[in-house]
Every structure is written in structure tokens, then in C-alpha cells.
Amino acid sequence: MAAIGVHLGCTSACVAVYKDGRAGVVANDAGDRVTPAVVAYSENEEIVGLAAKQSRIRNISNTVMKVKQILGRSSSDPQAQKYIAESKCLVIEKNGKLRYEIDTGEETKFVNPEDVARLIFSKMKETAHSVLGSDANDVVITVPFDFGEKQKNALGEAARAAGFNVLRLIHEPSAALLAYGIGQDSPTGKSNILVFKLGGTSLSLSVMEVNSGIYRVLSTNTDDNIGGAHFTETLAQYLASEFQRSFKHDVRGNARAMMKLTNSAEVAKHSLSTLGSANCFLDSLYEGQDFDCNVSRARFELLCSPLFNKCIEAIRGLLDQNGFTADDINKVVLCGGSSRIPKLQQLIKDLFPAVELLNSIPPDEVIPIGAAIEAGILIGKENLLVEDSLMIECSARDILVKGVDESGASRFTVLFPSGTPLPARRQHTLQAPGSISSVCLELYESDGKNSAKEETKFAQVVLQDLDKKENGLRDILAVLTMKRDGSLHVTCTDQETGKCEAISIEIAS
């Protein structure tokens, strides 16, 4: 049997397969190993990938990008609000759910984000089937460490809707370590690994402890203000200023011209990871005027120096948060396409001069390869070199129960603080007046790192038809068990009568 690993990022998606004892990325039908996570809608078809991205200049209002940023979120979510404000494809709330409004001229339809993600997963499945055949559908999906329960559920549902059998969701930094077999080279030793992931829209950092082949997340941090798109935008703004200098026209207010410059800047950025200079030529950029500009790597590095500095300061901040110094880190794993940038790699080497920088696997392929290896482990491949590796995932957010204090005000009790090693089990006793016949246990999550954190309800358990008591309180015992994949099982039992209700919030099948 064979297995599949899929990484759906904000700007791109990548699929790897495990077969015959090896894991590797599969190229799509265009010959590319990474597929743009873009879906375009036309009158008669849905286009996924590079063709959708290339057509966005002509069809921007019906082209969905960065769907991962809105998956499983509500209109009240600050990140969803930011996404809605920036999206060129109209996002509205319909029947309490966020929907893309697609107008192809013939009809207007409303598409939910999960369906967009389903199309991308279908493209990944089609790509995997090109080498494995149509019977291989077992998959491990990667998720960011800071994804909440609703985001994980939405991602899993989209993958299942595409026809995948989801074995597990795995956190991205754990997948990165699996790809390099970290923990197997010195299975009895203890080491600290920094996973540096610079993706299309964000910078994610994780410090992982590897001890006797066991992985544990010590700390993690994500900055949504640093990503590959920010480097591209910086270069695009420079190109716009060069056009203005040469032709006395400011095109920064022209959306079509700026999209052309952004596309050219993205190509140049990729070229500058291997070349000393890149040429940006645009035919008829503005009012019939062609634009030809050569950008050196040195110029690119100078323009982006504030972004490089932010990346390094983010690393220092995460180390300080753990009381670590650079000497406490044994290896650095590079992930995400933008971590290919030579200047950034050099700055990381300067910060960790005695540390091995792992980049032999293409950074945008590391995470899906790790997911494919995990899938191979789960379906019982006996000849995997990392078959004995064991990961301990951690809860990414605080998990809380809601109660009331003596004044009647809401009070939250944290049962699983962020960073709790999984699996884990907690008990909580909820007291309720004996005069009521139903009791509700409400579950919330919050970002424990945020001083202005907000609790978000994600589930509840209701005990109904309880016998009323004239006096006193009733005790309800809640037992919460969180599995390694982050799924949660909750039982609530009336201690006096034994009446019980249970729910499971499943993350992977």
C-alpha cells in the first residue's frame, strides 16, 4: 500500500507520496512540484492552480486566493475581517456562514471556503494518483500549530469531501522533523531544534525538544506580518517607483498595473535566490508603455533588509521566551519557499554559527514529505527508517470551561493550557442549582499568548431531563480527554443519578 501527505498553505499546496520505502513530492500536470492554492470560477468551470493564478488579472473578482486564512472562521473573527477587507473576491455572510460571492455573468452563486479547499485537495489527490493509482486515498494533512478546533475541523472536512481518507492531522513543525528523520540519528540523545517556516503570508517559529526519539513542542510563535508576499510587495513597490522615475507616471493607484508588477516581482524574487540579478520586462504596463528593469540581488537585499531584521528579531524573541540562547539550539530546519532566500539563510547562520542548518530538502517540500512519512507509519510500513519515531503533540491554545462566580459573572477555568503535551486527561466538577432540570458545559478556546485574549466557544455538552431537587446543588463531573491529534472527547455525568452525556470533537478520522 501507499500513503499520501498534503500541505495546504495560504499561497500554495504540495503533495508527497510514500511508496516502496521512500517519500517524495509529486509534480502536477504542469510539471510543477508546488501548486498555487488559487481557484478561479468561470461560467462553465472551476480552475485550480497555476492557470487560475495566471488568469486573475482578467478575472480577479471571481478568483479565490489564500482560502486557508478564512477556513473555519466566523465574521466576528479579527483575522476573517482582515481577510474580507483585503480579498478581491467578495466575501459575505449568508445564513450565518461566510461565503464567496461569485458572479460569472450568467449567474451569481455563493461558495463556502470549505468547497474552495476541497477543489485544491482534489487537485492534490489527482496529482498523487498520477503515480500511485486511484486506490490510494490514505492521507495525513498538515496544520499550523496555532489552528483552532474549528479551523482543523474545516480543513479535515474539506479533505474528506475531496475523497481522502484522513488518517491524521499533524502539526507542521512535527512534519518537518520527520522529513529529516531527526531523533533517529541519535535516538538516545536530547536536542533542541528550531523550525523556521517562512511561508507565503506568515512566519512561524517553533522550538522542538527531541529526546530519545520523542518530539515535543516547547514553544511556538507566528507573525502574520512577515511572509513571502511581503517580500514580493516590497519589490513590486520598488518597480513602481522605478517606472515613475522613468516615465513620470505613478501606477500605484492602478490595480491592473500593480498586479502585473506584483507578478513580475514574484518571478524576480524566485530568480534572485539562485542568480545575481533578474530582469523584469512588462509589455504595455501602462498606457501602452513597456517597462524594462534589471534588479540585482544586492538591491533586493537592501530593499528587504527591514523584513530580514524582523525575521531575526522574531527568532531572538522566541529564544528569550524560553530562556534559551543560540547555544541551546542544536539544529535549525528551514521550511517554506521564502526561506530559500540566500541573505536570510546567511543571517540565520550568523545567529547560530555552530549549528547545523538543514536545507537539503527543498524548503517548500519539507512539510508534505514529513506528512507522507507519518502516513506511511500509520498504515504500517515496516521498512521505514523512522518507524519507531514518536511525536508528542501539544495543545496549541488554551482550552477552557465556562462557569460563574459568586456574583454571577462569567468565569473561565483553563483545563488544557497551550503547550500541554498530548495525549492528556482532565477532570472538572461543575456545580449547578438542584432546581434546574438541565445543565450545559460550555467549552472555549483562546490564544494563551495574547494579553488581550478573547475566548471563543467551540462546543457544549448538555445534560437534560434531570430530576429536580428542592434544595442544594448538584455536582456534574466532566472528564475531558484530548488525543495526540488534538481531537477532544468529553463526558458529563450527574454524580447523584449517574446520568451521562458525551461528545467527541474529531479532528481526523
From Swiss-Prot:
Entry keywords, A to Z: ATP-binding, Chaperone, Cytoplasm, Nucleotide-binding
Misc. remarks from the entry: Acts as a potent immunoadjuvant, capable to interact with antigen-presenting cells and generating efficient CD8(+) T-cell responses. May be used as adjuvant to enhance effect of vaccine G1F/M2, a candidate vaccine against respiratory syncytial virus (RSV), a major respiratory pathogen in newborns. May also be used as adjuvant to prepare antigenic fusion protein for the therapeutics of cancers.
MF terms in GO: ATP binding; ATP hydrolysis activity; ATP-dependent protein folding chaperone; heat shock protein binding; protein folding chaperone
Family assignment from sequence similarity: Belongs to the heat shock protein 70 family.
The protein's name in its UniProt record: Heat shock 70 kDa protein 14
The protein's role, per its UniProt record: Component of the ribosome-associated complex (RAC), a complex involved in folding or maintaining nascent polypeptides in a folding-competent state. In the RAC complex, binds to the nascent polypeptide chain, while DNAJC2 stimulates its ATPase activity.
Swiss-Prot/TrEMBL GO biological process terms: 'de novo' cotranslational protein folding; chaperone cofactor-dependent protein refolding; protein refolding
Pfam family name, one: HSP70
Subunit (UniProt): Component of ribosome-associated complex (RAC), a heterodimer composed of Hsp70/DnaK-type chaperone HSPA14 and Hsp40/DnaJ-type chaperone DNAJC2.
Subcellular location: Cytoplasm, Cytosol
Gene for this chain: HSPA14
